[in-house]
């Protein structure tokens, strides 16, 4: 991606040993054109479409609610730490994940440094601390070969972002300096990474 296709890394997620768990890469002056993350694969996590303003995302939520189709909302609306984008994740009728996003940042300056997030910092997934649903790490769309047959899934054998720490699936209160337990009101229907 870097040498042959001319991509540059905008942001990545690493641990103290330098293990890369994910990287956001771009060719245009936006945060990313593609992102590579770890997990079982090959799979497509989601496809994203940009919109102009946050109110467009709220309007989508309102329309889904009015149509009694709000179950299509998987996650959000919210704001990512990585990319700073305002987002909404939906599931289409076939179960594929679709992101509608806006307001990431301009990356046209070639001297911009790579923004590196610690894998233990859960604000990387959601700036506001909203939990990430377990399906975020578990589900992805099947990749087909050139004949239209599903490509067999290969289980990940190296370090997994989800397995790195309880809470790597987006929960707050998992930074090393945070010693208190997650508040009871935040536990509910969401599961920690070790409970999936």
Where are the regions that the model predicts?
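Core segments of cupin and vicinal oxygen chelate
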Residues: 1-31, 195
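Vicinal oxygen chelate
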Residues: 2, 48-98, 102-196
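Short, charged/polar, Gly/Pro-enriched secondary-structure boundary elements
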Residues: 30-34, 96
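Solvent-exposed, charged amphipathic helical/linker segments at domain boundaries
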Residues: 33-36, 44
């Amino acid at each position: 991606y870097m040498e042959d296709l001319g991509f540059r890394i905008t942001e990545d997620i690493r641990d103290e040993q330098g293990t890369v768990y994910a990287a956001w890469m771009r060719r245009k002056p936006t945060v990313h054109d593609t992102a590579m993350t770890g997990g079982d694969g090959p799979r497509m996590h989601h496809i994203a479409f940009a919109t102009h303003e946050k109110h467009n995302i709220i309007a989508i939520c309102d329309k889904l609610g009015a149509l009694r189709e709000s179950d299509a909302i998987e996650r959000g609306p919210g704001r990512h730490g990585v990319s700073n984008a305002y987002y909404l994740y939906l599931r289409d009728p076939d179960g594929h994940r679709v992101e509608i996003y806006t307001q990431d940042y301009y990356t046209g300056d070639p001297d911009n440094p790579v923004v590196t997030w610690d894998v233990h910092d859960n604000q990387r997934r959601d700036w506001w601390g909203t939990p990430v649903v377990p399906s975020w790490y578990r589900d992805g769309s099947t990749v087909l070969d050139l004949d239209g047959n599903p490509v067999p899934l290969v289980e990940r054998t190296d370090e997994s972002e989800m397995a790195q720490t309880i809470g790597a699936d987006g929960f707050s209160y998992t930074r090393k300096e945070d010693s208190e337990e997650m508040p009871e009101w935040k536990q509910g229907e969401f599961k920690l990474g070790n409970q999936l």
